[in-house]
Regions:
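Aromatic "clamp/platform" in nucleotide-sugar-dependent glycosyltransferases that forms part
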Residues: 254
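Conserved acidic donor-binding segment of nucleotide-sugar-dependent glycosyltransferases
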Residues: 289-297, 304-310
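Carbohydrate-associated surface elements
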Residues: 133, 153
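Glycosyltransferase donor-sugar binding loop
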Residues: 22-28, 173, 199-215, 232
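Nucleotide-activated donor-binding/catalytic signature segment of Leloir-type glycosyltransferases, i.e.
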Residues: 213-234
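Membrane-proximal helix-turn-helix segments that form the acceptor-binding/catalytic region
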Residues: 97, 109-127
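Short hydrophobic beta-strand element within catalytic cores of glycosyltransferases
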Residues: 271-275
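Conserved donor-binding/catalytic core segment of Leloir-type glycosyltransferases
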Residues: 128, 161-181, 187-190, 202
Length: 343
């Protein structure tokens, strides 16, 4: 999310906005980079109780406070500071109000909602969603305020394109949260494919609460060690090189906020298999991705479709969609126009 916030901010500056990013810092002096003012704000508390101190000073002269993520105490504190100086705030939950996430750790979320999150949502000036189909997620919480609709942007490095799949592997990039990301479904899908047709799959990303070990055990249980490799998170040029050489990209999430790695893969023309979450449906509706239900059987069929001749045509269509609709400058201009109309 940090990278996306930076790219959003840089694009908003190019669109004519003045942007200040307040971040956790001690006595450091602020700085300016890429047209963005970086303002360190002292925080207090530990763990989930950490919150900004005297944020009111940083809000002097601000037209709007943008709060990223959800279910976070620092947002509760920051919103209270904004209200105290009559600065409206906009919530950027980035998929965190998806019903699947609301149901996770349900009792804790319910208590948190009653204590803090309900007021945060109710008193928001507006809320940002990626796609219109997310509206029911926030209305289910009782939110009836303004919505700003704009996806994340994506701009691959110059000269980076799909090379036709020279690496010979299907790639997944993400956080090792097996239930959320559907990695158990993906592995069972691979196991369903006849050995002679079974693809080699590479899984790269950071661990999440022991999820990598869960995936390793399932690989062993299913006898998939010759076909599935687990790797570390990759960034920068190494990530783009891995993407460009993949024979296909797969994203089997049971639910998802946006899925930046999907956007990255599609943007350079990699044949991509998605499940029907908002970005996946958006791409598939425009002929830019192969879509499958989040079941092992459906994903197995989708993996086999990645190697079909039509997959390259779908990939090319997806790259055109990304260039036309989801450049950072285009989405920033849309976000800014919608937000300014609400102020």
């Amino acid at each position: 999310m940090t990278g996306a916030v930076r790219r959003w901010s840089e694009s908003l500056v190019r669109a004519g906005a003045s942007v200040v990013i307040a971040f956790e810092g001690g006595g450091d002096e602020g700085s300016t980079s890429g047209g963005i003012e970086w303002l360190p704000v002292r925080h207090t508390g530990r763990g989930w109780r950490k919150r900004p101190v005297q944020l009111e000073h940083a809000l002097h002269g601000a037209d709007l406070l943008v709060l990223h993520s959800a279910w976070a105490f620092h947002n509760i504190s920051a919103a209270a500071a904004a209200r105290s100086v009559s600065v409206p705030y906009l919530l950027e939950p980035r998929g965190a109000y998806d019903p699947h996430i609301v149901r996770r750790r349900k009792l804790l979320k319910r208590a948190w909602w009653i204590a803090w999150e309900r007021e945060l949502v109710a008193r928001a000036h507006a809320m940002h969603i990626f796609f219109e189909e997310e509206r029911p997620h926030v209305t289910a919480l009782g939110y009836r305020g303004a919505l700003v609709r704009a996806p994340n942007g994506i701009e691959p490095p110059n000269g980076v394109h799909w090379d036709g799949g020279s690496g010979g592997y299907v790639l997944w990039l993400g956080r090792f949260d097996p239930e959320h990301k559907g990695l158990d479904l993906l592995l069972r899908a691979v196991a369903h494919i006849p050995i002679a047709e079974r693809p080699h799959v590479r899984l790269h990303g950071p661990d999440f609460r022991g999820g990598k070990d869960v995936v390793r055990r399932l690989i062993g249980t299913l006898g998939l060690d010759p076909w599935v490799m687990i790797g570390d998170a990759v960034h920068g040029q190494a990530k783009w090189a891995l993407l460009s050489r993949a024979s296909g990209f797969v994203y089997p999430s049971r639910w998802e906020g946006f899925g930046n790695s999907v956007a990255e893969a599609v943007s350079i023309g990699v044949p991509t298999l998605v499940t029907p979450y908002p970005l996946g449906r958006h791409l598939a509706s425009r002929g830019g991705a192969i879509i499958a239900e989040p079941t092992a059987d459906a994903l197995a069929a989708g993996l086999q479709a990645l190697s079909a001749q039509r997959a390259a045509e779908v990939a090319a269509a997806g790259a055109r969609v990304m260039r036309a609709e989801m450049s950072w400058d285009a989405v920033a201009r849309s976000w800014l126009a919608q937000t300014e109309a609400l102020l």
